[in-house]
Amino acid sequence: MERRRLAKKFFLLAGVVSVLVLCVYLAWFYHAQSIENDRRALAEARVLSAEIGAAWDYIDAVQPQINRATGETSGIYCAVAAKDIAKRFSAGSAYSIRYIRGNPRNTEDAPDDFERKALSSFEEGVVEEYYGLEHQGDSSVFRYVGLLEIEDGCLPCHGDPAGEKDITGYAKEGMAEGDVAGACPLLCPWIPSLPTRRPIWSAR
């Protein structure tokens, strides 16, 4: 009788330990998968950001040749070209790419709440990217915002003297190289291998 009682206790204890081990394993596996999902989404967003940035840089680099070929200002600027490329790409995919500024010249470039937090982080000067998972209805999306800084080629339109009209007809902001020009937000579809976690925001 005593032996039977001990056997029951042993099997009960073994069962409890097995359940605990299984729970720990599932928690670890879930966490590892979540980290991998984040890593994969972030890597994809960084590649897209670099590609659209390369298009911006290319138009900026060939701007003098474009103007010389036409004999006058062509109206094809880095910002105009990059925005058009972003719109064309976004229209034919589940992704969204656009450009924002804290003081936009165009209302369509105004940031939303998430993007304003990103711009604030950039202004503090400690991060160059801001990203996180966001639930929208029944689905989730990965949001990434990359910093855009004023470079030498930006100064004819955004540099000194502040208030003077640039070639596009807008008033210059009097900005200098290294200032925060704005940001490039990306919205990527989220397809995790496991159910998503609660939203987690990150800045780097």
What does each of the following model-derived ranges do?
Residues 4-31, 204:
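Extreme N-terminal signal-anchor transmembrane helix of membrane signaling/transducer proteins, especially
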Residues 30-53:
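Juxtamembrane membrane-water interface segments immediately C-terminal to a transmembrane helix
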Residues 50-57, 61, 65-151:
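Extracytoplasmic ligand-binding sensor domains of the Cache superfamily
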Residues 149-171:
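The canonical Cys-X-X-Cys-His
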